[in-house]
């Protein structure tokens, strides 16, 4: 099987997670500056066998997409142009940052480490992907 890549898109930084080849477990991969994201994903897909890309869909509590969607849509269009055969799906990302902070607390990370926004973004991408993998198994 191939891997699945998840993206927690941000204006400055973007967290990236990847599944194992059996598509059971999500692991944080890295956080990259958003302006380097398209090249990073393109290179990763060339090096690894990737089945699809999951993008965190920023929704508000009232179920409407948030302001950040205006930044995500142009990226997704560029991604689809560069990788036309790669399926791209959106997955609701509500509460992933809150869950990421909770995960860091439960893991016993020190306050300084919990304030590392790049780590929060990477963990958020991991939560998005793990949620997708679990939903897919149902």
Swiss-Prot record:
It is found in: Cytoplasm. One of its GO terms (cellular component) is cytosol. PANTHER family: POLYNUCLEOTIDYL TRANSFERASE, RIBONUCLEASE H-LIKE SUPERFAMILY PROTEIN. One of its GO terms (molecular function) is nuclease activity. Could be a nuclease involved in processing of the 5'-end of pre-16S rRNA. It comes from the Bacteria. SMART domains: YqgFc (SM00732). Keywords: Cytoplasm, Hydrolase, Nuclease, Ribosome biogenesis. Disulfide bonds: none annotated. Its EC number is 3.1.-.-. Pfam families: RuvX. InterPro entries: RNaseH-like_sf (IPR012337), YqgF (IPR005227), YqgF/RNaseH-like_dom (IPR006641), YqgF/RNaseH-like_dom_sf (IPR037027). HAMAP family: Nuclease_YqgF. Belongs to the YqgF nuclease family. It is an enzyme of class 3 (hydrolase). One of its GO terms (biological process) is rRNA 5'-end processing. This is Putative pre-16S rRNA nuclease.
